[in-house]
A protein has these predicted regions:
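Conserved, structured core segments of small domains
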Residues: 2-128
Length: 128
């Protein structure tokens, strides 16, 4: 069992949802509505099982901005940092015993069928 050494709780994992927005844009309104309902049900199931800590879908990539601060000056560009086939579309913050368990949980996230889920363990920062 992977217990966070700082908090003493189960580990937290950020599950980043990626998919090709062109695939989503090609869906019929009924397919899109069905996918959204599946995502809501998935979140509800994860929450009732005590694994869901938070999450949300993101607006399309054309609404994004990237900020870089160089020499104390902000530089903003439209869009994401890098152009890729799959775009960051949402996230789930989950709590699980270990990586194996969170992989099983993330496999139930509906957009995993359409793209990918990147799973990242959370590193808790603690004040001195």
């Amino acid at each position: 069992m992977a217990i966070d050494q700082i908090t003493g709780h189960f580990m937290k994992y950020l599950c980043l949802v990626y998919y090709d927005e062109n695939v989503i844009n090609a869906m019929s309104p009924q397919e899109w509505e069905s996918l959204n309902k599946e995502c809501i049900a998935c979140g509800d199931n994860l929450r009732s099982a005590g694994h869901f800590l938070g999450g949300n879908a993101l607006q399309p990539v054309n609404t994004a901005a990237t900020l870089r601060v160089r020499d104390g000056r902000p530089h903003v560009t439209d869009g994401p940092f890098a152009e890729t086939k799959e775009q960051l579309a949402g996230f789930y913050l989950l709590e699980a015993e270990n990586l194996d368990q969170v992989i099983q949980l993330a496999g139930k996230i509906p957009p995993a069928r359409l793209g990918s889920i990147e799973i990242r363990p959370i590193r808790e920062l603690q004040p001195d």
